[in-house]
């Protein structure tokens, strides 16, 4: 009887230890959201990294963003491109956020773009563009017995586009700005607009 109890205790102890080990492994494991050649975008716990796998299996990392618990990047892409003889990588993903009350709902979709130079492990440009769909209930009388639903869209920020020349174009419905890469400073700068033409 004593031997049986001892075996049960040992079995329970081993099971608990195995379970804890598995949990620890899961907590430190990463999830891959996008990959391009030796570059991958991965989530470790709540931190979103760009991993660069070098020869000899050594990995470099660039921290892209820290997320709130239970939040994840969506539709992630990695796009390498050449500018001024240097290869840069554009990482793009989406984030969703919803604010809701009894009379109003705001569903926001944010597109985040970060451009990195891998050699120096530098983020050379960050951009966010948000489109928010707003749904509101408006009452047409004081007693709030008759109502109508109004939908509208709010756009904020600029779309981030990389053209064939390796230049960044930030555009929305109202304006368009071009940026070029300055290798010495490791950053994109706006192209100065020339003087406006005078009417004759």
Region spans (language model):
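Bacterial Sec-dependent N-terminal signal peptides
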Residues: 1-26
């Amino acid at each position: 009887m004593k031997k049986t109890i001892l075996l049960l205790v040992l079995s329970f102890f081993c099971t608990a230890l195995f379970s804890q080990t598995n949990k620890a492994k899961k907590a430190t494991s990463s999830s891959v959201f996008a990959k391009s050649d030796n570059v991958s975008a991965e989530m470790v716990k709540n931190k979103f990294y760009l991993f660069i796998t070098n020869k000899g299996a050594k990995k470099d990392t660039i921290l892209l963003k820290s997320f709130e618990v239970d939040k994840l990047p969506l539709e992630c892409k990695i796009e390498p491109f050449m500018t001024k003889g240097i290869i840069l990588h554009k990482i793009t993903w989406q984030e969703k956020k919803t604010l809701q009350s009894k009379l109003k709902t705001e569903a926001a979709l944010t597109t985040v773009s970060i451009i990195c130079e891998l050699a120096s492990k530098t983020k050379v440009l960050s951009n966010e563009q948000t489109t928010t769909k707003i749904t509101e209930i408006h009452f047409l009388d004081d007693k709030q017995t008759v109502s109508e639903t109004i939908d509208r869209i709010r756009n904020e920020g600029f779309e981030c586009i990389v053209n064939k020349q390796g230049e960044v174009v930030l555009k929305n419905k109202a304006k368009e700005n071009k940026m070029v890469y300055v290798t010495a400073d490791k950053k994109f700068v706006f192209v100065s607009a020339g003087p406006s033409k005078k009417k004759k």
